[in-house]
From Swiss-Prot:
Protein name: Glycerol-3-phosphate dehydrogenase [NAD(P)+]
Gene3D superfamilies xrefs: N-(1-d-carboxylethyl)-l-norvaline Dehydrogenase, domain 2, NAD(P)-binding Rossmann-like Domain
UniProt main location, coarse: cytoplasm
The reaction(s) this protein catalyses: sn-glycerol 3-phosphate + NAD(+) = dihydroxyacetone phosphate + NADH + H(+); sn-glycerol 3-phosphate + NADP(+) = dihydroxyacetone phosphate + NADPH + H(+)
Positions that bind NADPH: 13, 34, 107, 139, 254, 276-277
Enzyme class: oxidoreductase
General function of this protein: Catalyzes the reduction of the glycolytic intermediate dihydroxyacetone phosphate (DHAP) to sn-glycerol 3-phosphate (G3P), the key precursor for phospholipid synthesis.
Molecular function via GO: glycerol-3-phosphate dehydrogenase [NAD(P)+] activity; NAD binding
Lineage of the organism: Bacteria, Pseudomonadati, Pseudomonadota, Alphaproteobacteria, Hyphomicrobiales
EC number(s) from the headed UniProt entry: 1.1.1.94
Pathway entry: Membrane lipid metabolism; glycerophospholipid metabolism
Length: 327
């Protein structure tokens, strides 16, 4: 079945996602952004060198700066950072078709409420099915046509499989899930752990420490996901372990680079920190973990370091001298 798909958000990920769906050739795809001049340039030049240098966008991809462009779309993907999603949903939600499925592509938790993004979408758009797309995929890799696999989760498997079929292509494969909680929290919490791994790298304390953080961080993620109603198996999949390994080891990751800067003792630009999803997620996850009585020492340490409440050397000592326990 052919779908009409709108991707909202003309940053790197939104543009890459729109391009790879358009290349699959099964759906009519429109990339929707707020900047009329940018969208006109993308339409005429088929290049978005500011975020995806040298990558030619497909001729079949349409562009629009009009909110009304989402009208008639059967699938609408919100591909902007988590803290900007609520405003975007309110702006574009007025124009959605009554049967449109909405998909959040952000990896974060609402900072003020601690809610998942699907909670926000269901609150703002109560008449629409809501799904989440997450997993190990850098925008540049997706746009270049490098093999990438991610997860898409909806309330029902029928909807999840429909979305996976509509969005997947030769080089971009989606796995269907019904665990929206696990898929979202994996995407949010791995950013915190990527910052921790960046601190380790910036501090120069070895790959063994990074491996320990990945393994023990995965245990933290699993405890948190299960406590919030998700499934432990999801944490071991693409949206959990897969995304964690990618983000904690690749310098394409903003979160890893932010952690490296912290580890080196560099003065971090507040504007840079504002773009790092893990910087938001750390404080929210640490607060929620305390409310749920969940042990998350790595997440707590990252939150305290970012807030300036804990020195990195003290954080390392605290983690290494915790009471001995079973794995």
């Amino acid at each position: 079945m052919s779908e009409k798909i709108a991707v909202i958000g003309s940053g790197a990920f939104g543009t890459a996602l729109a391009a790879v769906i358009a290349l699959a050739g099964r759906s009519a795809v429109t990339l929707v952004g707020r900047n009329p001049s940018l969208m006109a340039d993308l339409k005429s030049e088929r290049l978005h060198d500011a975020v995806l240098p040298g990558i030619v966008l497909p001729e079949s991809l349409e562009f629009s700066a009009e909110a009304e462009a989402v009208a008639g779309a059967s699938i609408v993907l919100f591909a902007m950072p988590s803290q900007a999603q609520a405003d975007a949903v309110r702006q574009y939600g007025l124009y959605l078709s009554k049967d449109a499925v909405v998909v959040t592509c952000a990896k974060g938790i609402e900072r003020t409420t601690g809610n998942l993004l699907t909670d926000m979408l269901e609150r703002e758009l109560p008449d629409h099915p809501v799904a989440v797309l997450s997993g190990p995929g850098f925008a540049a890799d997706i746009a270049k046509g490098l093999p990438t696999a991610m997860a898409i989760a909806a309330d029902g498997m029928e909807t999840a499989e429909r979305l996976a079929q509509a969005i997947s292509g030769r080089t971009f494969r989606l796995y269907a899930s019904t665990d929206r909680i696990g898929v979202q929290l994996g995407g949010a919490l791995k950013n915190v752990l990527a910052i921790a791994c960046g601190i380790v790298e910036g501090r120069g304390i070895g790959e063994s420490a990074r491996a320990a953080l990945i393994a023990r961080g995965l245990a933290e993620m699993s405890r948190f996901v299960v406590a919030k109603g998700g499934q432990a198996d999801t944490v071991r999949g693409l949206s959990g372990l897969g995304d964690l390994v990618l983000t904690a080891t690749s310098h394409q990751s903003r979160n890893l680079r932010f952690g490296i800067a912290l580890g080196r003792g560099e003065k971090t630009d507040p504007a840079h920190g504002a773009l790092v999803e893990g910087a938001f997620a750390a404080s929210v996850a640490s607060r929620l973990a305390a409310e749920l009585s969940i042990s998350m020492p790595i997440t707590d340490a990252v939150s305290a370091i970012i807030d300036g409440r804990l020195d990195i050397s003290d954080a390392i000592e605290q983690l290494m001298t915790r009471p001995i326990t079973t794995e």
